[in-house]
């Protein structure tokens, strides 16, 4: 593998395992266009290499906290009224779900909003005991249109519905009971190594054929794509929602709080 320097992620290869670490400590590990582009670049490289396992990791305190409101705010202040399409992010999650490698989310700390898209899209999700999971979008008049097809596929409609409406974090224990997390332990690094000991034995061709077969059994995510992208763009282009985001970034106040 060629040595490449990235702005938003750290990447390392260890035999047949690729580790992608979200690394935006200055932005609470939120998602921006560069992070999406860089992750797609690495996954494309993994597809044509000997990589059989891709591990996603974050910072110790936050795995991924969703959309970068600061970046969205800057776009709005520059006069951009129409929100950009989230198709690259949706495609990234679909690659994690269907690509010819086993994908693992190794979660420590907080996961919010779009961060749940990563967790839901991966084949396996493990965590330590500090992990928590939330969907905060409705607090801003939004909803997780692009996350929901992946989350519903993972934990079912009602639990995803409940998480969306309540907007509050669930613990790693609840996440495990709901099937969002497959395994958790205080020593999640050890837990990850145990998983990799088994997964390293799988060959790439077998993984690719199996994941193609699994994808053929359920077309929910691909069918929902156009509807989810349209809904997301409409929400982020709505003037009232934009004002709520601007106010939150400038003052730290939520939409329901008094001026």
Swiss-Prot record:
Class in the EC hierarchy, top level: lyase
EC number: 4.2.1.-
Main subcellular location of this protein, as a coarse class: cytoplasm
PROSITE patterns attached to this UniProt entry: ENOYL_COA_HYDRATASE
Cleavable signal peptide: none
Keyword field: Antibiotic biosynthesis, Cytoplasm, Lyase
Alphabetized InterPro entries for the sequence: ClpP/crotonase-like_dom_sf, Enoyl-CoA_hyd/isom_CS, Enoyl-CoA_hydra/iso, Enoyl-CoA_Hydratase/Isomerase
Protein's pathway: Antibiotic biosynthesis; bacillaene biosynthesis
Gene3D superfamilies: 2-enoyl-CoA Hydratase, Chain A, domain 1 (3.90.226.10)
Subcellular compartments: Cytoplasm
UniProt superkingdom: Bacteria
Pfam families the UniProt entry points to: ECH_1
Function noted in UniProt: Involved in some intermediate steps for the synthesis of the antibiotic polyketide bacillaene which is involved in secondary metabolism. Catalyzes the dehydration of the (S)-3-hydroxy-3-methylglutaryl group tethered to PksL to a 3-methylglutaconyl moiety.
Protein name: Bacillaene synthase dehydratase PksH
Gene that produces this protein: pksH
